[in-house]
Design a protein with these regions (language model features):
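Membrane-spanning helices that line or support transport/gating and their immediate boundary helices
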Residues: 42, 58, 162, 175, ...
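Juxtamembrane membrane-interface segments at transmembrane alpha-helix termini
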Residues: 67, 120-131, 188, 221-228, ...
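Membrane-interfacial loop-to-helix junctions in multi-pass transporters
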Residues: 83-89, 146-151, 181-187, 218-228, ...
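Aromatic-rich transmembrane-lumenal/periplasmic boundary elements in polytopic membrane proteins
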Residues: 197, 204-254
């Protein structure tokens, strides 16, 4: 009887422990989901600007398809206007995430996001790394030349928002009272990003080199490798790290140079263009179809709002190949 009682007691304790563990996991999962949903809403602020910028660039390329603005001042103006947004997408992410993730959506958080991004991209730029390591700029890891990406922008925004939520109401001594409250946030963000930069100094080259090495290995798989490349290209777009993978196939990193050979007509039929052709069905038909599906599944009261955003994103994808507005829409938000 004592043995049966002991086993039953132990089993009951284990059962209770399992229930508590499952409850803890579910609570953590719920917190994480709410955090990611808030991050998604924050990202939609900068993402909303992208379709207009993409359309401006698309019109410019349509006016001057061969010279890309070199043969038409109007085309050059439109391409430059749109490129000002697209080329600085990571800065928009830093500001938008910092503002959206702050507790009261104050402009000081947005300023802190900009400060965070400027600090990390300056400290980890090729020139600064060359000075810190006492080597020539040409000898610096190429990863530091790609530090201004969306992934770094999101990290900068999250750090800035965290600093704002923590220090925006801190009051310093009377002698330093001018720097109290919200004025303290950009200062603390700068110090925090120095530490983040120190960590990224060691981690970022490994991440970037790993992506390049991965691209090099799958390039040896022929057509199957092209499919794998396309899959991971789409997967990495929300972080901006797809540029590391693209550099392996599109340019002359490992003697593939897909874009260069295609435009120079010096490639091999059936091989050259392999790492570009698969994008056209997705950009011209797949994503616009996804936009239509999201519009139809949106709630009736939100169809007009969703329709405006999705139409601009679909046009951007079809005509210009800029797919981020569409992809960020369904990665971070539900259709409704």
């Amino acid at each position: 009887v004592f043995f049966i009682y002991t086993v039953a007691t132990v089993s009951e304790d284990r059962y209770r422990l399992c229930i508590e563990l499952i409850s803890f996991i579910l609570r953590r999962k719920n917190i994480m989901m709410k955090y990611l949903q808030k991050l998604g809403r924050s990202l939609m602020l900068p993402v909303a600007v992208l379709p207009v910028a993409s359309i401006l660039m698309g019109i410019g390329y349509w006016i001057d398809p061969s010279g890309w603005g070199g043969g038409s001042p109007i085309a050059a103006f439109l391409i430059s206007a749109g490129g000002a947004i697209i080329d600085n997408m990571s800065i928009l992410f830093a500001v938008g995430v910092a503002l959206g993730m702050s507790k009261d959506k104050d402009g000081s958080a947005a300023l802190a996001g900009l400060v965070a991004f400027l600090v990390v991209t300056k400290l980890l730029s090729t020139g600064t790394v060359a000075q810190l390591t006492q080597v020539d700029a040409e000898a610096v890891n190429t990863a530091f030349g790609k530090i201004s990406n969306q992934f770094i922008g999101i990290i900068s925004g999250l750090v800035a928002a965290s600093m704002y939520n923590r220090f925006s109401h801190v009051q310093l001594t009377p002698a330093l009272s001018f720097f109290s409250g919200k004025r303290l946030v950009p200062i603390m963000t700068s110090f925090a990003m120095i530490l983040v930069s120190a960590v990224l100094f060691f981690i970022w080259p490994v991440v970037y080199s790993g992506l390049v090495a991965f691209g090099t290995s799958i390039s040896e798989l022929g057509a199957v490798g092209a499919g794998i490349y396309g899959f991971f290209n789409r997967l990495l777009i929300p972080t901006g790290l797809h540029h590391a993978l693209n550099s392996v196939f599109w340019f002359d990193a490992i003697d593939i140079n897909d874009i260069g050979n295609f435009w120079a007509s010096t490639g091999t039929p059936g091989i050259t263009g392999r790492y570009q052709a698969g994008f056209f069905p997705v950009m011209m038909f797949g994503l616009p179809a996804a936009a239509l599906a999201m519009y139809h599944t949106a709630k009736d009261k939100k169809k007009k709002v969703a329709g405006g955003l999705l139409l601009a994103a679909a046009v951007s994808s079809f005509f210009t190949g800029v797919t981020e507005p569409m992809e960020f829409a369904f990665v971070f938000l539900a259709p409704g």
